[in-house]
Amino acid sequence: MKRTFLLLLLAICAGNLAAQTANDSLPKLDPKLKATLNATDQAAYQIAMAYSDQAVAKSKLFDLMVRNPDDVRYREALANLYFDSRQYASAALVSLDILQTNGKNIGALEIAAYSLEQLGALDRALPHFESLHLLTGDNFSLYKSAFIQYSLKRYEEAMNSVNMLIKSAKADDKVGFPKSQTETQEIGMKAAALNLKGLIYLDQNSMAEAKTAFNEAISLDPAFDQAKENLKKTN
């Protein structure tokens, strides 16, 4: 996990240096020519996306990025393309590059958080989920923060996040839980938070408290299969 992020960090540093060197050495284009080239590449990008040709779309985005190094839109589009094609390392690199310039870029925070999570770098994904919640008030980002804190055995932080979530969860907030290999069960956020609270207690051998939390989760959503299975572990 640490090695994965170290490689990402080295790649970011090398990429920034290479990009700066390349930008410094590029000749200045006539504004009209630049606008024409931009319009041509943007049109080609749109056509490539319409035909699901991501390779050409990425190529055009790179051309646009080189020509317009200060326009973050092209990096954002590239990060989305990488993420959608499950190239999580590349998605993380681009989004982290964006965040170096603007740490409050919501799209980049989302892609960085989920990409780093997919790469197994949970300790690096966590601050991005936390920032997302602070900036947007999104309860799912808070749930992800709590679950990662629990996974990292940072139980006090996880419990604080869970208690915040129990208070702020809305009726239409849902979390998906796997029911089978092909089926997902949608559970209310408050019930999901109580289930996570039970898991935190369970990890600390606080069986009575865990049992109470699981029972509360089931009372909110009687069809909550995972909470029922977790409840059995308290007997």
Set out the residue ranges of the language-model regions:
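N-terminal leader/linker segments that initiate helical-solenoid repeat arrays
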Residues: 18-73
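Short coil turns that delineate tetratricopeptide repeat
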Residues: 69, 103, 136-137, 170, ...
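TPR alpha-solenoid repeat register
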Residues: 74, 108, 141-142, 174-175, ...
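Canonical tetratricopeptide repeat
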Residues: 77, 111, 144, 189, ...
